[in-house]
């Protein structure tokens, strides 16, 4: 992004108007099921662009150990940030009004924090 997309976006004056991101609620377990690892929740997301408050980690990095307070059994780790919180933050930046966020992020009402604050 730093060496490919950003110079082009800067050249055309769009560096603060374009945001690149990955989004998934898919993860893997810490343990093997004999054929690999099973499906689980959580993962690392990437957000890049001129309007991103970068250089920070949003959420809490869990202790990746069986039996830790983050692990709920079967090697499954509970994420500290919901995919819907992530989506709602981006949707707000795109201009979606707060009352409409549940159309984009259906479970956003389950969280005290709707906007994670990573967009300017």
Q: Which ranges hold each PLM region?
A:
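Short, small-residue-biased leader/transition segments that mark boundaries at the very start
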Residues: 2-6
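Metal-dependent active-site segment of extracytoplasmic phospho-/sulfohydrolases and closely related
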Residues: 9-34
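Membrane-interface soluble catalytic domains
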Residues: 10-15, 65-120
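Extracellular/periplasmic catalytic domains that process cell-envelope and extracellular macromolecules
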Residues: 13-16, 37-41, 51
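Hydrophobic, well-ordered secondary-structure elements that form the walls
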Residues: 25, 45, 90
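Short, well-ordered loop/turn and helix-capping segments at boundaries between secondary-structure elements
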Residues: 32, 51-53, 92, 96
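Short, solvent-exposed loop/turn and secondary-structure capping segments
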Residues: 32-35, 57-58, 102
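Substrate-binding rim/cap in mid-to-C-terminal beta-strand-loop elements of soluble/periplasmic
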Residues: 42-74
């Amino acid at each position: 992004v730093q060496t490919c997309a950003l110079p082009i976006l800067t050249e055309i004056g769009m560096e603060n108007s374009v945001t690149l991101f990955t989004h998934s609620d898919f993860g893997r377990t810490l343990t093997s099921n004999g054929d690999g690892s099973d499906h689980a929740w959580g993962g690392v997301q990437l957000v890049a662009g001129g309007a991103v408050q970068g250089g920070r980690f949003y959420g809490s990095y869990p202790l990746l150990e069986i039996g830790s307070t983050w692990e709920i059994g079967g090697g499954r780790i509970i994420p500290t940030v919901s995919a819907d919180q992530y989506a709602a933050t981006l949707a707000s930046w795109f201009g979606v009004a707060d009352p409409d966020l549940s159309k984009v992020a259906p479970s956003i009402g389950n969280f005290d924090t709707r906007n994670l604050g990573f967009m300017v």
